[in-house]
Amino acid sequence: MIVLGIDPGSRRCGYGVVAREGARLTVVESGVLVPGDLPMAQRLGRILDGLDALIARARPLEASVESVFSGASPRSALVLGQARGVALAAAARAGLPVFEYAPSEVKLAFTGNGRAGKDQMLRTARMLLGAAPGLSDEADALAIAVCHLARRAFAVPAAGAGRAAAARAAAARLRPSRRDHRGTP
């Protein structure tokens, strides 16, 4: 199973394509789309073009996107909503099913801490995936993909009281795709 994780943004859009074979996770491709200092419509167009090219290249079977964080200012939420719309449109145009996860849900599944900071997300990406994301947007996108793979692999329920514990247990069963610096899995 190959999944595309997207951390939408109008200035930086993180993406992470992760493959799961059994319990082994492998990063297919990850990075950040940076459309430059352009008017909003042109930035969104460049992000759409970048996501279209990525989907054609990596051929994911499903996409997962971070849902809107409601604590942002109304203007920030509107801009984020536009960037999410572009991500959803790219996935829909490619015929990919799209799954959405709250930021705290992604952090919990990825690190075991629903309030994990940027440093913890970056460290977990290195430890779990052997990846070296340069920006937190990239680490977040990888985390979104892993969260979705964990849900699919271990039938974590979409709702209910046991959701957090089940997500942590599912993430704990995933093995890194590479050895860490000490040479152990």
Curated annotation (Swiss-Prot):
InterPro entries the UniProt entry points to: RNaseH-like_sf, RNaseH_sf, X-over_junc_endoDNase_RuvC
SUPFAM superfamilies found in the cross-reference section: Ribonuclease H-like
Cofactor requirements of the protein: Mg(2+)
Residues annotated as binding Mg(2+) 1: 7, 137
Residues annotated as transmembrane: none
EC code(s) of this entry: 3.1.21.10
GO molecular function, one term: crossover junction DNA endonuclease activity
GO cellular component entries: cytoplasm; Holliday junction resolvase complex
Residue positions of the active site: 7, 66, 137
GO biological process, one term: DNA recombination
Top-level taxon: Bacteria
Entry's cofactor comment: Binds 2 Mg(2+) ion per subunit.
List of residues binding Mg(2+) 2: 66
Name of a matching Pfam family: RuvC
Catalytic reaction list: Endonucleolytic cleavage at a junction such as a reciprocal single-stranded crossover between two homologous DNA duplexes (Holliday junction)
Entry keyword set: Cytoplasm, DNA damage, DNA recombination, DNA repair, DNA-binding, Endonuclease, Hydrolase, Magnesium, Metal-binding, Nuclease
Family annotation (PANTHER family): CROSSOVER JUNCTION ENDODEOXYRIBONUCLEASE RUVC
Function: The RuvA-RuvB-RuvC complex processes Holliday junction (HJ) DNA during genetic recombination and DNA repair. Endonuclease that resolves HJ intermediates. Cleaves cruciform DNA by making single-stranded nicks across the HJ at symmetrical positions within the homologous arms, yielding a 5'-phosphate and a 3'-hydroxyl group; requires a central core of homology in the junction. The consensus cleavage sequence is 5'-(A/T)TT(C/G)-3'. Cleavage occurs on the 3'-side of the TT dinucleotide at the point of strand exchange.
Similarity remark: Belongs to the RuvC family.
Protein name: Crossover junction endodeoxyribonuclease RuvC
Organism field: Anaeromyxobacter dehalogenans (strain 2CP-1 / ATCC BAA-258)
